[in-house]
Design a protein with these regions (language model features):
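C-terminal accessory segments of proteins
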Residues: 22-536
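Fungal secretory targeting signals
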Residues: 1-30
């Protein structure tokens, strides 16, 4: 619904007042980190796994922690502070780079979710944070002298944000769970509040004008746990997206049918809980940067294995802070509020299509001479778990695999929430929906393979396995500690899908899928009744 003119005028006045300090200094162009790139070979510095970076320690680790600490302690009205950059995502709904709200906007943050812009928008967002962190690291490196000087200067040039590979292990990295941390300063060890653990609000209690409805939260960002109970389901979801999607639009967003990286990304948000549950607050937790670096990484690996970098189909926006509801989004639509180097032209999906645009890469995609086959082999090693000849031989027989398709209108749900799928009492997978957008059809696809295996289903009668699955399948829709009856959600549609899966002939190939069948689940009181259809 479009904002009424009077409401919009009042909202604009409040937002302009809040964002006035930021607007005074002029736009901050998003160029990423330009330092540390080999001027001869063009080799790019790596965004590293946070656990690898911590284990290696040394100057880069020291500068990461000290740099993040410096950003968190910058004044809130500094455009280059942690507070100001994190605030672009959700609250305090204030203009950044002078880019204000528009009539027909959502009244929320700038960030798109359930949209093909999800990944490119966050790529620009992370690049802004990374270049600001790099500036702090290079400043801090100058404090080190004597034998340490050159090592810290070199590390400051190559420092990039690390990622948390929740697709391999969704438990919180150890370095993010300790409240205090010790690193090496120019004159010895320094004990700090760990910036990877939480962000402490400088103004507390929170300003109700900036954070309406959040005045009662604690003095720092919080978490409730991690995804340690979802390791296999998340890995399956990620691998299914790598191996079955063929276009950017499918891979990037839950706005279309099939699996996507947005789904496990959402599951991590909801499982971590605390501040991570709220799209208004989540980006203030530095863990958010690590989380989204991994989403960016997965998309970059997908691009390297599929040679596809751009949104294909136009998408109708549900409305954002500076984007009107109904606006048609393409790969050339602006990623507000992120300007290119000229400070006047917005980035688009096209200008941020590669990691090279912002001066970094990932260990999984080392360069142009690394072919698609090597990237696929790495995907298979990391996420399918088949890394030896014996493993591949054991998986060489074609078989029928089973999936659940989920479709639901977000407007029918109390967001954020989870839709958990079970076979009998065996957890099979989860579709997680975040608090925004409030409307729009969400799609997901979850693997039933592990749950089917645990049920020891070996029914050779035609259609027998499918009927067994339909009888045993049920879902739970939960928000916090409350469970909803699926029959009270009229738009919720559940399909059981079967596909013939032919394993790859080598580790450098994906499996192929064929002979797809679909059975629609209809909820009648406590029974599950199926009507079987076959897709063309």
């Amino acid at each position: 619904m479009l904002l009424e003119a009077r409401t919009y005028a009042l909202y604009l006045a409040i937002a302009t007042k809040i964002g006035h300090a930021n607007a005074q200094t002029g736009p901050v162009p998003v160029v990423g980190m330009t330092a540390g790139i080999d001027q001869v070979t063009g080799k790019l510095p790596l965004r590293m796994n946070i656990e690898t970076l911590e284990q290696e320690g040394g100057p880069m680790w020291d500068l990461l922690i000290r740099g993040l600490d410096a950003l968190q302690n910058k004044p809130e009205d500094d455009q280059r502070s942690h507070f100001a950059i994190a605030g672009i995502h959700g609250m305090p709904y204030a203009p950044y780079n002078g880019v204000g709200p528009v009539p027909g906007g959502s009244g929320g943050g700038y960030c798109p979710h359930q949209s093909p812009q999800l990944i490119p928008w966050h790529r620009a967002f992370l690049a802004l944070y990374e270049q600001t962190l790099g500036d702090e690291a290079q400043r801090l490196a100058l404090e080190y002298t004597d034998n340490d000087a050159s090592a810290y200067r070199e590390a400051s040039q190559k420092l990039r944000l690390p990622y948390w590979d929740w697709a391999s292990d969704p438990t919180l990295p150890p370095s993010t769970t300790q409240e205090n941390i010790t690193v090496n300063g120019p004159e010895g060890e320094i004990n700090l509040h760990n910036p990877l653990y939480s962000y402490r609000w400088q103004t507390y209690p929170l300003n109700e004008t900036q954070f309406p409805g959040h005045g009662e939260i604690g003095p720092e960002t919080t978490r409730q746990g991690g995804g340690n109970d979802m390791t296999k389901f998340i890995k399956d979801s990620v691998y299914r997206t790598f191996s079955s999607t063929t276009t950017w639009d499918e891979m990037a967003s839950m706005a279309g049918s099939g699996s996507s990286f947005e789904s496990p990304h959402n599951a991590i948000h909801n499982s971590v809980g605390g501040s991570f549950l709220s799209l208004d607050l989540t980006s203030f937790d530095t863990l958010f940067m690590l989380h989204h670096c991994n989403l960016d990484r997965l998309s970059a690996i997908w691009t390297a294995s599929h040679h596809d970098t751009l949104q294909v189909q136009p998408f109708t926006s549900q409305g954002l802070y500076s984007t009107a509801k109904g606006e048609i989004i393409t790969a050339d639509s602006p990623l507000k509020p992120f300007y290119q180097a000229d400070g006047r032209t917005f980035h688009t999906g096209r200008t941020v299509a590669t990691t090279e645009a912002f001066g970094y890469t990932y260990p999984d995609i080392l360069g142009g001479d690394q072919g698609r086959k090597e990237v696929i082999a790495q995907i298979n090693r990391l996420y399918r778990g088949l890394s030896t000849t014996e493993d591949w031989a054991a998986a060489s027989t074609s078989r029928r695999e089973w999936f659940v398709e989920i479709e639901v209108d977000r407007a029918d749900l109390p967001l954020p929430c989870n839709i958990d799928v079970y076979l009998g009492d065996r957890f099979a997978g989860r579709t997680s929906l975040l608090s925004m957008p409030k409307t729009g059809i969400a799609y997901d696809e979850l693997s039933l393979s592990r749950a089917v295996k645990s049920l020891d289903v070996h029914d050779n009668e035609p259609g027998g396995t499918e009927r067994r699955l339909m009888n045993d399948l049920h879902v739970r829709v939960t928000k916090g500690g409350t469970t909803l009856d699926p029959r009270d959600i009229p738009s919720l549609h559940i399909n059981v899908v079967g596909e013939e899966v032919t394993p790859p002939s080598s580790e450098s190939e994906f499996p192929s899928y064929s002979n797809r069948t679909t059975a629609t689940v209809i909820y009648v009181p406590t029974l599950h009744v199926a009507r079987a259809d076959t897709d063309d």
